Amino acid sequence: MGCDGGTIPKRHELVKGPKKVEKVDKDAELVAQWNYCTLSQEILRRPIVACELGRLYNKDAVIEFLLDKSAEKALGKAASHIKSIKNVTELKLSDNPAWEGDKGNTKGDKHDDLQRARFICPVVGLEMNGRHRFCFLRCCGCVFSERALKEIKAEVCHTCGAAFQEDDVIVLNGTKEDVDVLKTRMEERRLRAKLEKKTKKPKAAESVSKPDVSEEAPGPSKVKTGKPEEASLDSREKKTNLAPKSTATNESSSGKAGKPPCGATKRSIADSEESEAYKSLFTTHSSAKRSKEESAHWVTHTSYCF
């Protein structure tokens, strides 16, 4: 069963020892990180988005993940921190003019240069192939190399001119230390947003519960600041409106009571300048009065009987 014909077996062929740890090819790892989607493992195609930890995704893959969060997907752990589409930023990438794409090696008789990248830094011109550190801004989504950020120190984006802070700078495909720092920043940012939302809710409730002071609560009379001509016209209109009301109230009061108003003197018809025929209609006229001889003493009468 072997070992014949002068063959000498070696020790490693007969004795099984511990397996050596397989070393990952760095070039292959860089190609996978910078050219393929972290979630779907497909080639990156526009629109390309990045999360708060600096990982690259296809936007349609992120939308599908958010719509169907099934536990069976093993790759869902890579995007478990993405709760909504607001947690990712669409990147503004600059194309590499030297990139030929799939047209460069259609026959398969040429060597594929893995160091050639699809995108470059718009400021310095470095290729985004993983050999150089790249970052993007959360506020605008512009992508440029870290060297450009260090060489040209400014508080404004180098490409679009938008203002940014140090917290907005996120390293793409960084090391474990970079990911830890970005994770702590992400947690602090989300906690801060929750606290702000909680403080806004009671303020909104108070504004709804409190009534409008101008409508219900009585306050001082408002002084109209306008021209004197307009003020005089308003006062005249008010007087004319109040005059008929006062006359109507006087008529109604006099009609109900049947008495002259207070302070008015009683007017006798005998003193008036009317004719004698008109005066004779009333009991106060001399023709309506009788002497004591003409009237019986035992009959009580009034002047209305005559």
Curated annotation (Swiss-Prot):
GO cellular component: nucleus; replication fork
Keywords (A to Z) from UniProt: Chromosome, Phosphoprotein
Description of post-translational modifications: Undergoes proteasomal degradation, via DDI1 and DDI2. Removal from stalled replisomes and degradation are required for genome stability.
UniProt keyword NAD, yes or no: no
Modified residues (Phosphoserine): 287
Record region (Disordered): 193-306
Gene Ontology MF: a single term: DNA binding
Residue ranges, compositional bias (Basic and acidic residues): 226-240
Polar residues compositional bias, start-end: 243-255
Compartment(s) where it occurs, according to its Swiss-Prot or TrEMBL record: Chromosome
Single Gene Ontology BP annotation: regulation of DNA stability
Function: Replication termination factor which is a component of the elongating replisome. Required for ATR pathway signaling upon DNA damage and has a positive activity during DNA replication. Might function to facilitate fork pausing at replication fork barriers like the rDNA. May be globally required to stimulate ATR signaling after the fork stalls or encounters a lesion. Interacts with nascent DNA.
Subunit record text: Interacts with DDI2; probably also interacts with DDI1.
Family according to the record: Belongs to the rtf2 family.
PANTHER family: PROTEIN C20ORF43 HOMOLOG, REPLICATION TERMINATION FACTOR 2
Name under which the protein is recorded: Replication termination factor 2
Species, as recorded: Pongo abelii (Sumatran orangutan)
Gene: RTF2
